[in-house]
Amino acid sequence: MHRSTFIRTSGTSSRTLTARYRSQYTGLLVARVLFSTSTTRAQGGNPRSPLQIFRDTFKKEWEKSQELQENIKTLQDASGKLGESEAYKKAREAYLKAQRGSTIVGKTLKKTGETMEHIATKAWESELGKNTRKAAAATAKKLDESFEPVRQTKIYKEVSEVIDDGESSRYGGFITKEQRRLKRERDLASGKRHRAVKSNEDAGTAVVATNIESKESFGKKVEDFKEKTVVGRSIQSLKNKLWDESENPLIVVMRKITNKVGGFFAETESSRVYSQFKLMDPTFSNESFTRHLREYIVPEILEAYVKGDVKVLKKWFSEAPFNVYAAQQKIFKEQDVYADGRILDIRGVEIVSAKLLAPQDIPVLVVGCRAQEINLYRKKKTGEIAAGDEANILMSSYAMVFTRDPEQIDDDETEGWKILEFVRGGSRQFT
C-alpha cells in the first residue's frame, strides 16, 4: 500500500516538475526579450520593431534549450516506464491482497466478539457467577466496615482535608446529602468559604462634621461650560456639524474607529451583572460561587429533582418552575407512584453567561451541567418498579437561570439564590 502510494506520488511529482521547468523557461524568455528591447533603445542603434526583436531572441534561446528539452523528455519517459514496471505491479497486487485480508479479518473479529459476548452473558447469569458476585459484595461490605475506624482517626481526616483542595469537584463526582452538609459546615468553620454578608443600606448615612469643602467634579464643570456659556454652546454646535453629522468619508472612518476604541473600555453586560451581585454581598466572587455551585447547590437541586423532593425544590425554585414541577408530581401521586431516581455523577458545572433581564435589568447567571442519572418510579404500596430500569443510566443536560433576592441573603440554606428557569435538556443512554 505504501509502495503504490509512493509510485503515484512520483508520477505526480514528475508532471509537476515538468510544468515548473516550462514555466521557468517561458519567464526567462520574456525577461530576455524585454532586456534586449531596452538595451537596443538605450544604445540608439538601428531601430527594429518589437516583433523582430522578440522573434530573434526567441530563436536564439530555443536553440540553447536542447538540454532542457532532453531533461523534460527523460522525466516523461521515466514516469511512463515506472507505471509499467514490475515493482509497480507487485506493489499493487500486495495492496489488493491487504485490502481483501483486512475485510476477512474484520468479519472474523466481529464474529469472535459476538461469541465472546454470548459466553460472557452465560457466565454472568450462571449459578457460579451469581454466587461469586454475592461473595464479592459481602467481602466489600466487610472491608468497608473494618476500615471505618481508620476513617475516624485524626491522621486520616487531616490527610483527606489536604487532598480535597476544593478542585476535585471540577472533574465530576457526587457525594451524599449528608456529606455535602458536613463539608459545607467544615469549609465555613475553617474559613475556606465565607458566609454571605448582607449589604448595610444604612451605612454611611450618619452626619459627620468635617472641615472638608465639597469640590465640584471636572466633568460637571465641562458640562456646565457647554450648556451655560455662549462659547461652550458655539463649540458644541461646531462639533456636531463638523464631527457628529459630517458625511465626509475620512470623518466617517475616524468616527467609526473612535467608537470602536471607546467600546473596548466600556463596561460589559457581564461586569455590570457581577457588580450588582457584589453590591448585594461584598464577599461574592465568580470563582467562589462556581465552586459552591459544584459542591453544594447543583447536587442538592438535581438530587431533589430526580427523587421528587418537593420540599427542597420549593426553597430554590421561584414560583414559575416550581408550579410546573408540582403539577408533574401531582400526576404521579394520582397514579400511586413516586420518583426514586439516583444521581451518579455531575460534571461540567459552569457559569455559561451573565445577563441583565429587561425591562427591570434583573441580574441573572445562566448555569449549565451534565449528569449521569437513573430515573425510577415505584409503586407506593409495594415499592415495586413501575417505570424505569436500575441498569439504564442516562446522560442528561441541565440549564438553570439563577438570580439573587437581597432580602434573603441571610438564609442559611439558599443565601438568597433563586432559580428563575429550570430546563432538563436532551437525555441519551450512557454507554
From Swiss-Prot:
Binding positions (ATP): G101, S102, T103, I104, V105, G106, K107, T108
Pfam families per record: Tim44
Membrane topology: Peripheral membrane protein
Localization in the cell: Mitochondrion inner membrane
Family annotation (SMART domains): Tim44
Biological process according to GO: intracellular protein transport; protein import into mitochondrial matrix
Region (Interaction with SSC1): 43-209
UniProt entry keywords in alphabetical sequence: ATP-binding, Membrane, Mitochondrion, Mitochondrion inner membrane, Nucleotide-binding, Protein transport, Transit peptide, Translocation, Transport
One of the record's GO molecular function terms: ATP binding
Gene3D superfamilies documented for this protein: 3.10.450.240
GO cellular component, one term: mitochondrial inner membrane
Function: Essential component of the PAM complex, a complex required for the translocation of transit peptide-containing proteins from the inner membrane into the mitochondrial matrix in an ATP-dependent manner. Recruits mitochondrial HSP70 and its co-chaperone (MGE1) to drive protein translocation into the matrix using ATP as an energy source.
Family indicated by similarity: Belongs to the Tim44 family.
Self-association state and partner proteins as the record states: Component of the PAM complex, at least composed of SSC1 (mtHsp70), MGE1, TIM44, PAM16/TIM16, PAM17 and PAM18/TIM14. Forms part of the receptor complex that consists of at least 3 different proteins (TIM17, TIM23, TIM44).
Record-given protein name: Mitochondrial import inner membrane translocase subunit TIM44
Species assigned in the record: Saccharomyces cerevisiae (strain ATCC 204508 / S288c) (Baker's yeast)
